[in-house]
Amino acid sequence: MQAEVRIERYADQGRCVAHIDGRVVFVRFALPDELVRVELDEPHDRDDRFWTGEVVEVLEPSVDRVTPAWPLAGPLAMGGGVGGADLVHVSLPGQLKWKAITVSEQMSRLGHIDVAVPIERMPGDKAAGGLNWRTRIEMIADDNGMPSMRRRGTHNRVAIDTMPLATRTLLDVAKREHVWEGGFEPGSQIRLSVPEPRGEIVDTAAADDNYAVLVDGELRAGSQLLTEQVTINGTTF
């Protein structure tokens, strides 16, 4: 079932709120004030407290809307659906606004504290376009043994040959360890973890080996023990 709705406000999990005949609908890949056409998730019953759905067409876009930097993670109707990037359709300033409003609303609703919560980007994030920040990724091998991700709401696996959200260090490890070349048993769980150095790296040799590639829980490359390091106000932890 499809419906045309006016999006009202931000919600959680990268969704926004709209109403259909008085019922709350949580909509993926939408933005406040937009007029969109939504495909409702099945099943949806009239007795349900709320419905969920996803944008299939944007009739009146928000100024904060952008073309998804990673199309595979965008709406199903636009060739996406692999998940992992809930705000892929939102500009960088729009993402900050979304998060600031959401956190402030939760502080008010749960903590009864009315305060505007500032949200700031980490150094270098703007230059990276909001990408290259994940230090861990998980995939599943498709029927051809290639790393893939499941399309949302299905068992379909979509082969991938990169992960734009992953740090450049993680992507370098994946390339060096031939992860994108496949050769895995179909259905295998593939996990990569590469802690990102923050602050001064004291032991460079240890940092070079500070990663793990696991297949079905077994270490294929790297180290069993990983070290996370961060420097705050001059103190390294």
Annotate each language-model stretch with its function:
Residues 1-237:
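Accessory RNA-recognition modules of RNA-modification enzymes
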